Amino acid sequence: MSIIDSTTGANASNLPLSPLLVILGNTGSGKSALAINLAKVIPAGIINADSRQIYSRMDIATAKPTLSEMLEIPHYLYSFIQPDQPFSLAEYQTLAYQAIDSLHTQNRLPVLVGGSGQYLKAVLEGWSIPPVAPDETFRAALFEKAEKEGGDVIFTELEKKDPQAATQIDPRNIRRVVRALEVIHKTGGKFSGLLIKNPPPYRVFKIGIHIPREELYRTVDLRVEKMLEQGLEAEVRSLLEKGYKASLPSMSGIGYRQIAKYIEGGISLTEAVEQMKFETHRLIRQQNTYFRLTDTNIHWITLEESRSNGIIQLVCDFLAAENKNEIH
């Protein structure tokens, strides 16, 4: 019997729910490496839950899996959106569910991997995204304000109007901050209050990789240096030469924004690198609002444990425990 055979029929009330493994944690914590190692032993497919890794042509600063890794193991929702192509949270949620169902059909374990809390919550909690039509005039005014005064200004506005929504949205993702403010503006209510939850019929096991903050800071600082060595400047130059403007939401990601500013003469390369490190540290702190060590629904492991055979046994135990919601 395959690993999924015993859980087929997730929508039938008298049958066990189909399994979904989630690997989460801070940027630079080794999530992708763990997922790939597991998929080499257990029939599985990897689904991206990182809002930066959806874009094509943007590989180095987003730290995507390598091409050889993607060819060896089924990967979903990586590099499928052009840098100037609009893409909504609702679209991601729909595609993620399709990928999960596809893997179940293939008798493979779906492994949802990423550090974008909003992507993870939208899928795991079954958010019903508010169907509010865009207000282009309102949007344009906010984007202009963010460009002139900085994204922090409009994020602060969101924090005042809807503190709960502010904890669920990456402050660097200007497009999503604008969308939340737009919904608040058009409905008169809170964006967070409009998110109706309808959890999908999956038996979920969440594994979180925890690395002490100072150790993680050192790790990501070294990764920033490595990105420069791998050709990040050339990658950003290529994007700009192809007509992808630095003001695009995709270009607001760490690494692209700073190197674009350096290329355009706004800052030195040294300043760009320091800003990349600072923003990565900030992202780690932001992610910690999503991924808390006190969350008993997450099975936390160390980096060393993520590299051990014990983690494989843990996942096998999860697959064997059809009627349990947690593995301890």
UniProtKB/Swiss-Prot annotation:
InterPro entries: Dimethylallyltransferase, IPT, P-loop_NTPase. Belongs to the IPP transferase family. Monomer. The lineage of its organism: Bacteria, Bacillati, Chloroflexota, Dehalococcoidia, Dehalococcoidales. It holds the Pfam family IPPT. Its cofactor is Mg(2+). It is an enzyme of class 2 (transferase). NCBIfam families: miaA. The record marks S116, R139 as: Interaction with substrate tRNA. Keywords: ATP-binding, Magnesium, Nucleotide-binding, Transferase, tRNA processing. Catalyzes the transfer of a dimethylallyl group onto the adenine at position 37 in tRNAs that read codons beginning with uridine, leading to the formation of N6-(dimethylallyl)adenosine (i(6)A). Substrate binds at T27, G28, S29, G30, K31, S32. Its EC number is 2.5.1.75. One of its GO terms (biological process) is tRNA modification. Residues 50-53 are annotated as: Interaction with substrate tRNA. It comes from Dehalococcoides mccartyi (strain ATCC BAA-2100 / JCM 16839 / KCTC 5957 / BAV1). This is tRNA dimethylallyltransferase. ATP binds at G25, N26, T27, G28, S29, G30, K31, S32. It catalyses: adenosine(37) in tRNA + dimethylallyl diphosphate = N(6)-dimethylallyladenosine(37) in tRNA + diphosphate. GO terms for molecular function: ATP binding; tRNA dimethylallyltransferase activity.
